[in-house]
Amino acid sequence: MYGLVIEGVRFMIQENWGPQVLLQVQKLTSLSEKSVSTHDQYSEHVVPQMFKAIHEITGTPYEQIGVLAGRFFVQFLIRNGYGDLMNVMGRRFSDFIKGLDNIHEYFRFSYPKLRAPSFYCKSESEDGLILHYRSRRTGYLSYVIGQLVELARVFYQLDIGIQVLKKKEKGRFTFVVLKISFDNVGLGQDLKLKERVKNLNEYLPVDTKSFLQMFPFHIAFNKKLEILMAGQGLLNLMPNIQGLLMTDVFDLQRPCIKFTAEGIMVHQNCVFQIESLHPVVKQTEENITVQINDITEDKVSLEKKTVMDNEYESLPYVTLRGPITVLKSSETFLLLATCVVDTLDTMFKMGLYLNDFGESDCNREIIMATIQKSDTLKTMLENEKRRSEVLTEMTREISEAKKTARTLLTQMMPYEVAQTMMRSGSVDHCEAFECVSIGFIRVCDFSKISLFIEAFEVVNLLNTIYSHLDSIVDTHGVYKVETIGESYMISAGCPYRDDYDAEMVSDCCLEMVSHIKSFEYQSHDAVKKVLIKCGIFTGPVVGGVVGVRTPRYCLFGDTVNTASRMESSNQTPMTIQIGQRTKDRVEKQASGAFRIKPKGNVFVKGKGDMRVYEIEKKKGRARYKKSDPLRKKMVAEKKEAEELLDEDNEGHRSSALSRMSLGESIDSSSSRRGSLSGSQLELNKTIAQTIELTSKASAALDLNMQDENNRPPTWSASHSQDIRKPRKTESKITLNSRLSSSDLAVSRVETSKDSDGETPRPTSSELKEVNRIREEALAQEKEEERTTKEENQKIEEVGEDHVSEATSLLDSEVSHGDNNISFSQMPSDSIPHEDRTSLPSATPSEIGDAISKKKLEKEDSNSSMSSLDERTTVSAKPTTTRRLLNQKDLEKEKKRSSMAGSSVTSSSAHSHSIRSKKDTRDKSRCKCEDIRADNKLKTKVCSIM
């Protein structure tokens, strides 16, 4: 697997969870110490391990991680310049799926050892198609589904549905049948095209000579796969293939089916690729060997000799690629292939020349373009490759040195403390422990032994003894603190707290004494037997790291001094002396399992007389587990990581697996497709949920793609427009749309573009201002609704009741500034001066009309702006009500002649005041309609308002 896929997963983690999660995933997958190169190959287990690490860190379901990684990989390819290629691979989504293998072949130019999966389609209809997915890897189904969903959404604006009809994993191989549902609108056009081609066949006959010239590498074979005819270009390379079986000469590489006539009939829409089973090399008659017959010396034979520069060089194989057409009239299969070559050196070894290709074959141009490459560029690439190899070797050496340093650091101090130091780079560590058992072990009469042996023998003796003691310490799970000369210090309960600290140290010392009894030093005759003595004490201590150049983990406290005194005051070799605290704690933890003998009082320096005891032996087994779980877990994780890193990657080698074996394994275990099983239904349900959950993250990534800082330089503005075509379900943002701030951010893709053709991005302050204006508009709408409702209610009451009630409205009190003026009690000369000029000296109806108009103008001047749409709605209902009111006034005028004039006049005055209100609103309305008309002002609403 190439690093391009790993980089895509890292891109997904960075965009979706952030750099902290990415660092944690890299540490769990052993990728933190080296950079990933897109053109280097890595183990197939890296990506599944990354998915597993993401699941453990974030708790996201595994299937959802796979779908999300597939969707983000499409965006990653777009950012790296592959978007233009994928944008032109198919006019319709069905065409794109049919050409997936062609995309992989294109990538093979940059990634020559690519082991791509195989895709081919069946049962295409107007509602979708059936896709067969075959791969040499397992665990990538959700990853592929995510890619298909994102490709359809980004490039074709389609929301597709995917259902797993069949899934099988056999060894390292995966065979899946997917049903992809979408609106396949182009299928009818394809059927019409086939009908046109069928009609053209009657008018465009092709003679055999022209056909052979167009396809010099064609192969014709029958249903038994017998080769009937081959092109001249192929016969120049493989002259004796006619009459042989296709399966005896070639290996079917694509598609992943069994090489049979039935399989070819079913997969006619696929591009086939076959490769010769045996290498093809050029033969020449320049070197002639003469072989003399044993019977007659007259007869000689000439033998062609194969010319090869180096027998260890890679041998060339003939690779043919093209469609297979079925000739129904003769029941013959025709492979219209072209020969695929990589380099000129391969052509020379095979004996292939440019004129062997057809005149319309594009391989000529590709090969000529290869020849024209600059020699300087080749030299630079070779030098860069050598530098890269040197850098890789240096990186490997640095990694080994770091690994060794970590190992030494974890041996010098506790594992957790060492990890903290490696992460932070600081040596500041101090921790208090309430109850710790400390043990000291000393070699007896060491000064006398040193007199009889040389200095290097002394070192060798101590090293041998301490090595035996180290193995015992690891067994009981206690911690070796340090060695000072002939003294050996251990502890339990620190740095790892334990409820059986005293029992652990006591058991360890008993085993040490027992082991030393049977120990014999063979290197020197003067020292055969070695004796030790032990001292144990329990109490509180403080542990921490001291030193900078050579940091050490040390224990401090009175307990350490007392434990040392327990050992030094012990005068009996091969015994274990303990204090009162240790005795009480051992009896509590072991429940009388130890046989402890009192030794009376012993004078201890700095302590005076202390009661001491001697541990003789123990009966029964230990209540704790005799192992160091943390250290064993660390070793297991380290071993597992090293196995994953050192595992041989089969992708580094050229693929030699026959695709026929894949097809045979499929056919041998295939069964009829019936109803979906429960596991498949559950899988389809999970897939649908994960697609829906990952859609939001993918849409958010589209917004980031529109940012010019994130957009790659090769991504043109026109391509960005194609990518972001609005879907049918989307609508443009209006000023009075009730959207939250997050909805506004997601809908920015629908905002209009400026004169330069680029999408303007509103700032955060502008978005806040738009939200504020929207809230004010909503509040104003509610106020307008309330006012309109009150006015309509008053008008309806006037229409239903007696007309005289409408006249009484003129006598109502009207709020005017700080004073309440009643016109029924005040003469016209008592009206304020600012209002008197607007009142004519006319009939009371005209006076009421003017007063109502003045009142409405005051109300409108104090009210804020509202939306145009709501004003239009408000003005509709009073108009209808006014018409009903006028009709009722005319009817009542006939009945009451005395009151008709004043009533109708007052009613019409009130109606005229409403019209005046409408006119005033129309004049003072906001510019919302103009804002909608001018797209540039949509993000500048705050300045307009």
Curated annotation (Swiss-Prot):
Alphabetized InterPro entries for the sequence: A/G_cyclase, A/G_cyclase_CS, H-NOX_domain_sf, Heme_NO-bd, HNOB_dom_associated, HNOB_dom_associated_sf, NO_sig/Golgi_transp_ligand-bd, Nucleotide_cyclase
Localization terms from the record: Cytoplasm
Keyword Membrane belongs to the record: no
Reaction catalysed by this enzyme: GTP = 3',5'-cyclic GMP + diphosphate
Comp. bias (Polar residues): 711-720, 732-744, 817-828, 862-884
Annotated GO biological process: chemosensory behavior; nitric oxide-cGMP-mediated signaling; response to oxygen levels; sensory perception of bitter taste
Sequence ranges of Basic and acidic residues compositional bias: 721-731, 750-759, 766-804, 851-861, 886-896, 916-930
Main location: cytoplasm
Cofactor section: heme
Coiled coil location: 388-413, 763-802
Family as reported in the entry's similarity comment: Belongs to the adenylyl cyclase class-4/guanylyl cyclase family.
Protein name: Soluble guanylate cyclase gcy-33
The organism of origin for this protein: Caenorhabditis elegans
Gene: gcy-33
